[in-house]
Amino acid sequence: MFAKSSRLLLPIIVPAVLIGTLFGLCTPAHADDAHPDGSVPPAGANDWTCRPSAAHPQPVVLVHGTWGNQNSWDVLAPQLKAQGYCVFSLSYGRAISSMRGAQPGVYGTADMRNSAREIARFVDEVRAATGTPKVDIVAHSQGGPLVRQFMRFDGGANQQNPADNKVDHLVTIAATNHGTTAEGLGFLLPTGSAQAPILGVIARYLGTAAAQQLIDSEFLRSLNAGGDTEPGVKYTVIASRLDRVVTPPETTFLKAGIGATVDNVWVQDLCPDDEFDHGALPESPTVGYFVQKALDPAYSGPACQG
């Protein structure tokens, strides 16, 4: 039980500790990229003349995570392109209203409901350019629940007629599908109306999206209220036991609903020595293997590094 003085300090202590923890754990966009501001797609992405082949009939859309941009895919995008995929990426969720979001090259800080609508528009652009009714999506961290928001609320999936879905396969990498406890600190948040001021402080420093990914946030309650999945969509959910951002790591896993298939996988079950942290997981050879195997079950490339 907190003493009265401690309870009075909670509105100051809790956001300060959460901000420090989340800031320390999350990995920003690569400072050594040729275009760290996210304005230029990674090699292999956004060839708008690309037409999908019979071997890979769906274009692949890459969706980065919080504080990242499309350069998060500078390893995976050229790998997928080399395998014959049409690959597309974007930088979404730019919002300079927060201290973190005002920094150059930092995206994925805006309200996730607005960012989901950005994803919806981009997917429609890709479908129109490639002449395909559906896309496959690979999403990291925030990108996972963001795409699920797009599918559920912004036209990405049709529960009444799954044949009209715009997404065939969603592959997530360390996604905050059910939120994060920020290594347990999220449980310190008060409930009800007392939570709003604290989340407001977090949003001003780290961005609205950071607050929305804390466990039991209003955004996640709304997203997950109707179940984790959409009929007709295939899901591959990739998790690392060493993840210190999505905590506990298994909260990323999804439960298949009617008409959906879900494959929840641990990186370390395939490659026990894989120690890539949360922000670097899109560069992990193990993750790359899981992604390519999910998109094409016939893929037989190397899995583990070394």
Each language-model region and where it sits:
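Active-site catalytic motif of lipid deacylating hydrolases and related acyltransferases
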Residues: D33-S39, N46, S53-K134, G192
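Serine-dependent carboxylesterase/thioesterase catalytic core
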Residues: H64, V87, G105, S115-L223
